């Protein structure tokens, strides 16, 4: 060890502890020592720019996490270095600091030694340190002071950055790069050194883009770029015609559109909002549980990310951006409905990354051109994007049909200018209570949707006094765009310009992509304690159950979902049935009533209505085993093949409503797997070729009955639509008339039988069912617009006898007028 090292090393270590009193960076990964698990090769840290602050921060975190010190001597391949760190880019000059054109001499010596020693192993660990996180602004007159951007900070600026941004700093350890795998046999030392340096430079650039985002254009500059887009100019010319006066007015209109749309990210605003949101989350939620976040880190460095979450609450916008920012990734640009562009609030959201879009572009070619050009610029510059493929918030807890508008513009922008590969990331939000719950129920009951306003937001502040449980955020499996394009048209990179006319095959890609995103969201579902309680209690007539029976039903649900696993991305609660009940009681969604023979757990009528939302969140996970259980409500035994036939019959309609992932051709095998899962739980038994329900009155029989009841409302809706078709006759009803009849009949049925589920008469569900009937060619639309069908449709009604009780079937039929075929249903 050198004399300087003996003197300076203790000072460095002391200084790092003092420095840590105000500089406390967020470290990623949370346990960096795992990067070196099972590897005892010597380590050398690589810093991009270096400096005293970076060295002290790295030294302190290495002490905390038990990693080799960057200040320790490095003995490698016969050479000795006075530190286990390399600075890739230094500045020269004492007063006027300029980037040095020379590389790292230490790195050069290490590469030479590795080659001389026949490729001896050394682990290079890139360490990126960002003092404050905001990207640079292209062509801006000044940069945000003391925040991390694309400029190499000078000493004075770095000093103040550590003072003011010490606790808004990210220190990221990347995966080790084995030097031997980079330095191949036969490379000359100078060539090998240049190769290693280039790989590290590219790595740091990609990491910076993933963390702070690409350079931000000033909003005015970006608007000007949009205004010069060929598509926008063509739309202006088409609307203005030959009139010079109209050309000026149309140009101004286009500019106003661009200004209405464009985000204006302000990192000082982001930091203020981040602290405010942290306070809000801590006040109303018991925590935010995240799963599979590692998927984001795997793709962020070299992909353009389009976040595609389900839409359950207005908080979705804020939650995902908050989580992404806290994961050390660049803040996404979020597509927000123009209804959120309220006074004051809209400006804050815009500075947090929101760009606004109108609900419909129909008939406004100019607006569509401006929006498309803006989106293209965001993609081309490498910004991550977030939008809701469903379009609006789900009022029922089920996924809505994907809307193709934003997908079409994203795909079109990428085809026009493919840069970084685009991946779509499905994101699942699982809430335990919703702030908008009551308004959703009112809207499903027929009330008009309330318009967002500042006063409405102020009124909702009272919600901050309530406890909304936990929020679960699951990251789905990323969906790359290029394989879909390659499968649809291998020549898409050299085809005619997308700007001229959208090729027909692109529509198929958009449909496939939308379905894949919805499937990815469902596959990443979070099963929450509240959704399990809702699933169990809503299956009972009075939404109540003995506590012991409820414990058994909850345990069955968890075991069944573990055995019949919808997807490896689905997460289950790590709680006992007793803990789940206690949790529900704490959130006041259930109440426990003491009784000498055993406590009874129940939901109030109001809570039962709200809890249908959370049951629907997870209904797709239970759909197949619950449908099998449903077949045993009216009968005690069925052949295996008959069960498969019944599931085949209803599967296309269940698939459309619940966005189930299995292909129709595979459903027999899926049914068999679900049967085996039920047999393992001993709520079904096998007798030869028959499957048999347990003895009436037994606990397993009760469990099977409760599971089957969860699917009955869906089957009742299907049967109601068929009954209305048959009783009115072929060629009598239009699609719109049938939908209206279905909704009104279901609403009356719910009133008579006290069905606490407003989604039972949701018009959108009947719309999807009728659309599936048409897609399966069960019904057809004639030239006059009326629905026609054959006698085959009556088979569905006849099979309903096996599932639906006689009382409910007659109640449904009593709501319809007698007509041809009435007596056969």
Segments from the language model and where they lie:
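Membrane-interfacial terminal anchoring regions of lipid-handling membrane enzymes
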Residues: 1-825
